[in-house]
Amino acid sequence: MKPLSSPLQQYWQTVVERLPEPLAEESLSAQAKSVLTFSDFVQDSVIAHPEWLTELESQPPQADEWQHYAAWLQEALSNVSDEAGLMRELRLFRRRIMVRIAWAQTLALVTEESILQQLSHLAETLIVAARDWLYDACCREWGTPCNAQGEAQPLLILGMGKLGGGELNFSSDIDLIFAWPEHGCTQGGRRELDNAQFFTRMGQRLIKVLDQPTQDGFVYRVDMRLRPFGESGPLVLSFAALEDYYQEQGRDWERYAMVKARIMGDSDGVYANELRAMLRPFVFRRYIDFSVIQSLRNMKGMIAREVRRRGLTDNIKLGAGGIREIEFIVQVFQLIRGGREPSLQSRALLPTLSAIAALHLLSENDAEQLRVAYLFLRRLENLLQSINDEQTQTLPSDELTRARLAWAMDFADWPQLTGVLTAHMANVRRVFNELIGDDESETQEESLSEQWRELWQDALQEDDTTPVLAHLSEDERKQVLMLIADFRKELDKRTIGPRGRQVLDHLMPHLLSDVCAREDAAVTLSRITALLVGIVTRTTYLELLSEFPAALKHLISLCAASPMIASQLARYPLLLDELLDPNTLYQPTATDAYRDELRQYLLRVPEDDEEQQLEALRQFKQAQLLRIAAADIAGTLPVMKVSDHLTWLAEAMIDAVVQQAWVQMVARYGKPNHLNEREGRGFAVVGYGKLGGWELGYSSDLDLIFLHDCPMDAMTDGEREIDGRQFYLRLAQRIMHLFSTRTSSGILYEVDARLRPSGAAGMLVTSAEAFADYQKNEAWTWEHQALVRARVVYGDPQLTAHFDAVRREIMTLPREGKTLQTEVREMREKMRAHLGNKHRDRFDIKADEGGITDIEFITQYLVLRYAHEKPKLTRWSDNVRILELLAQNDIMEEQEAMALTRAYTTLRDELHHLALQELPGHVSEDCFTAERELVRASWQKWLVEE
C-alpha cells in the first residue's frame, strides 16, 4: 500500500485528535490510518460506530460481498415492527455498507467495475426490501390489490440512469418509475381501494421511507421526475397507461432515459417480462434509426449550454470530455442500431462499448481510450464523493482535498493527476466531436479585408476617413467611430485574458462588417456594444458569436429590431445560446408544449436545490420570451398568437412554481389529511385580467387569487402538524415568494393578489365557499366585471368546476340595466381620472378615451347585462371571443363586433411593438383616430344612451 503523502501525514495528526479512546492511534492498522485520513465520511461513521472499524479490520471488504447484501439486510430487518424502525435500520445498513465500499475503494482492494456493481446492488437491495416490507404493511391495512381475476398485483419499480445500468456513483440520488400491471381493487381489507389509490399511497410511503431525512440521515434522495408527465403526472401508472404514454407521447429524451431502465428485484417474473417486452419497441427501433442523429445534435448543444450556464469548467461529469459525453457516445450507437444489434441493448456502459468495438462501429483504439477514460473518471468521481458522502463532480480548489485525491489516484501530486485527467478528457472530446459533428463542415469564410481589421484595431478618430464607411452619412459615420472608440475604452477598464482579446479581435471585424452594411448602423452598434461590454470577460460567449456566423447575424438583426431584446441579452447572456438554432429561435414552443418543455428543462436541476430551481425557471422564461419576441419581430406570429404564447408560458410557470411550493410545504408539514379521501391537492390558482383573458403582454404582471377546499377541522399529517387552512395560507405565501424572489436572473413575474375577496385587507388564500359567499353578498359591481375575465389557470378538476359554477352564477344574475350602466360608467370615469393621459398631445393606448380599457368595459357591461337571458355569454374570458358571442347571440350587430375586434387587436399589436422598442404605451395624438372614433361611438351607444 502506498504511504500517505506529506500533506496527508500532517492531516493525520488532526484526525488523531478527533478519535475517541477506543480508537487510539497505536491500535489502528496502516490501512485504517489511510482510509480515516482520506475520508471524513468514514471517519465520522466509525467514531459513531467503532464496531464497524473492528469488523473492517477482521473481515476486509471482498469483491463479491454484494451477493450477501440481501441476507444481511433481512437479518437487520427481522425485528422491525413499525415504519420508524424500518427507516432507522435501512439508514444504518446503508451507512455501514457504504463505509465498507469506501474502505475498499480508497485502498483499491477491488476494481472500479466492482465498486460500481456494489453501489448499485446496495441501492437495489435497500429499495426492494423497503418496497416488500411496505407492500405487506399496506396489504394488512387496506387489503391486497388484485386484478379482475383476483390475482395479486405487485408494485414494479424501474431503476433509471446509473442505477439501472448498474453504475451508480458513491453519493447519488436514484431515479425511479413506479408501475403496476392491471386495474382492479383491494381484497381482504377493512375498506376497498382501487389499485391506483393503493399503489399511489404505497408509493408515497416508499419515497418517504427512502428519502426523508431523520437523525440517522436518509437512504437515498429519490427523484421521480422521469415518470410520464413528470411531477404533474400520477405517481404510479398501470402498464396500460405506460404503454399509451410511450406510444403516443414518448419524447426522444425519454427514449435515452429508458435505455438504462432496469426492473428492481425479481426481474424474471411474468409481470416483469411483460413490462420489459412492452417498453423494448419504444427504446430500440427495428430499423437503423438515423433520425435520432438530429436529436442527439440538439442534446449535444444542450450539454454545451449546460456547461456554459453553470460554469462547469472543472466538472468531470458534465464538462467537455467528461463522463456524460462518454455515456452519450455509447447511447448514439444504442439508439441508432440497437434494434438490429442485440449486443447493443445492454444497460451497462462498458459491455456496450465492447460490443461497439466488436461491430467495428468505433476503432479499437478509440474504444479502448474511452474505456480507460471512463474507469479513470468514475474512480475519480467516486473518490471525490466518498470524502464527505457528497454529491459533487466538481474538482476541488482546496489543497487538502487535492492532496487526498492525488494520493488515492496513485499520483505524486495534483498537477500530475490533472495532467493525466486532461489527456483522458481530450480523447473523449475528440471522439465526441467526430461522432456527432454538424451535417456540413463549416466553410472557411474568406478573410475579411484589411480595412475592417484596421477599423477595429487602429482606433480611428472621428475625422478619419475609411473606405468601408464611405456609404454612411457623415453623422452616421462619426457616431460609428465614436461608438467603436468608446467600446475600446470600456475594454481597457476590464480584465480580459489573452484568449479573450484574441477572440474579440477575430469577432469584431466580422461584426462591424455586418452592422455597417445596415442603414441604422449606429443605433444597432450602440445596442450590441452595450451587450458586448457585459460579456467580454466571459470568453465562452465571445467564442460562440465568433464561431457561429449565423448566431452573430441573428444577434444583429434582433438587436436592430428591438432594444428590449438587446437589453435582455445584455442582462442575461445565457440567452445567446438561443441564437444558435434559427429553427427554434423563430419558432416558439407549441402552445400546448410549454409545460413539457419546462419539465424537461427542470430535470437537469436537483429537485432539492431551491436556488438552482429558481434560476432555471427564470432562465427558461427568458429564453421562451426571446423566441416569442423573435417570431413577433419576424412577422410569423400575429398579435393574438403572441398573447396566447405569453399566456401559455405563464401558466407553465405557475404550474412549476405551485409544484415547487407544494413539495416544500409537504416536506415541512405533511399534507392536509382531507386529501386522503380524494385525488388532487385541494388548491386552485385563478387568473384575472390579462392572464385570465389570454391577453398577456411582454411585461405584464399576473393578477392571481388562490382558493382551497379545506374543511375547518383538517390538519396536516407530517411530524410538524399544523392546521390545514394554515397550510394553504403558507403555500400561497410560498408561491408569492418564489415568483418575487430576485436572483441573478431577476424575478419571475410581478404578482398582484389584490383582486381577492376584501382586497389587500383579505386573506391571501380563500376557501371556495367563502369566495362564493363573498361574490354573492359583498362584491362590488367592478369585482363582478373582473370576474368576466377570470378563469382557473391551475387547479383540481373539482375546484375548477366549483369556480366555473360560481362565476357562471354571479354573471347570470338579473341586473337592472340603468343601475348597472351607471355603476360601470362611473367606475370607468374614476379610472380615467386616476390613470388617464398625463402627457399632453399624446394618446394613451390603454387608459385614454377610445382605448383598450373602454373596449374591455363595453364587453364586461354587456356580459353582466345580458348573461341572465343568454348564459352562453359566460363561456369565454377573453374580449375577442366575448365579442363573437355578443354577435352570435344577437346582442351586438356582427359588423360592430368585428369592427371593435379589429380596433382591439390593432391597439394591442401596437402595445406589443412599443414594448419591443422599450417605449411607453402612448403615441401621437393623431394616431388611431378611426379606431378611437369607433370605440367612442360604441361607448356612447351602450353606456350612455341605451
From Swiss-Prot:
Q: What is this enzyme's EC?
A: 2.7.7.89, 2.7.7.42
Q: Which UniProt keywords apply?
A: ATP-binding, Magnesium, Multifunctional enzyme, Nucleotide-binding, Nucleotidyltransferase, Transferase
One protein family per Pfam: GlnE
| Catalytic reaction list | [glutamine synthetase]-O(4)-(5'-adenylyl)-L-tyrosine + phosphate = [glutamine synthetase]-L-tyrosine + ADP; [glutamine synthetase]-L-tyrosine + ATP = [glutamine synthetase]-O(4)-(5'-adenylyl)-L-tyrosine + diphosphate
Report the GO terms under cellular component.
cytosol
One GO biological process term is: regulation of glutamine family amino acid metabolic process
**Keyword Transferase applies:** yes
Q: What class of enzyme is it?
A: transferase
May I ask which residue range the UniProt record assigns to the signal sequence? none
Molecular functions (GO terms): [glutamate-ammonia-ligase] adenylyltransferase activity; [glutamine synthetase]-adenylyl-L-tyrosine phosphorylase activity; ATP binding; magnesium ion binding
What cofactor requirement does the entry state?
A: Mg(2+)
Q: Do you know which PANTHER family this protein is assigned to?
A: BIFUNCTIONAL GLUTAMINE SYNTHETASE ADENYLYLTRANSFERASE_ADENYLYL-REMOVING ENZYME (PTHR30621:SF0), GLUTAMINE SYNTHETASE ADENYLYLTRANSFERASE (PTHR30621)
- Summary of the function given for this chain in its UniProt record: Involved in the regulation of glutamine synthetase GlnA, a key enzyme in the process to assimilate ammonia. When cellular nitrogen levels are high, the C-terminal adenylyl transferase (AT) inactivates GlnA by covalent transfer of an adenylyl group from ATP to specific tyrosine residue of GlnA, thus reducing its activity. Conversely, when nitrogen levels are low, the N-terminal adenylyl removase (AR) activates GlnA by removing the adenylyl group by phosphorolysis, increasing its activity.
Which family does the record claim for this protein? Belongs to the GlnE family.
Database matches in HAMAP family: GlnE
Q: NCBIfam families, per this entry?
A: PRK11072.1
Q: What is this protein called?
A: Bifunctional glutamine synthetase adenylyltransferase/adenylyl-removing enzyme
Species the sequence originates in: Escherichia coli O45:K1 (strain S88 / ExPEC)
